[in-house]
């Protein structure tokens, strides 16, 4: 019974950290300095039920997108369920979850750091390819694709910093506190 409570508390702690990270998206920040990549990597690493590993981080991202797009930014006149280009962002998010699920079986500083850097590159490549593929800003040739990636480079700083800082926070807090025994009556 005690082991079952510890497992439930651990699982609940993982979910709380993911939800907390998604809430931090509403705090003003430098461009692209967000927790979304870290949420995906963390969820993939610790939620060993494959269904939960994908559902919880993606649902958390989507709910925070609903709040941001409809109440904080309100770019659109109507209620926005999905924004243009969301498939590119969510696809990269799913790949990052898979990276966490497959490659972070043993958590170490090195493994988290390497997967964080790789994940930020994957996010950058996929989402900016999506910007180019939309056909609305760049010519639909190799030159347009190169210009798109070059224009996105200044934003990569925020992306990689966000991935590193939030991954350090999520993995660090969880690894530091996972063995703390809470007594309750």
Locations of the language-model features?
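Hydrophobic transmembrane alpha-helices
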Residues: 4-46, 51-56
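Short, charged juxtamembrane terminal tails flanking transmembrane helices
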Residues: 5-6, 178-185
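Hydrophobic alpha-helical transmembrane segments
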Residues: 11-16, 51-55, 87-91, 113-117, ...
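Aromatic-anchored segments of alpha-helical transmembrane domains
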Residues: 18-27, 58-71, 120-129
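Structural signal for the C-terminal ends of transmembrane alpha-helices
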Residues: 23, 42-49, 95-107, 173-181
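Hydrophobic core segments of transmembrane alpha-helices in multi-pass, intramembrane catalytic enzymes
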Residues: 36-40, 88-96, 166-167
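Short helix-perturbing small/polar motifs within transmembrane alpha-helices
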Residues: 74-124
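Membrane-embedded alpha-helical hairpins and interfacial helices in multi-pass inner-membrane proteins
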Residues: 105-179
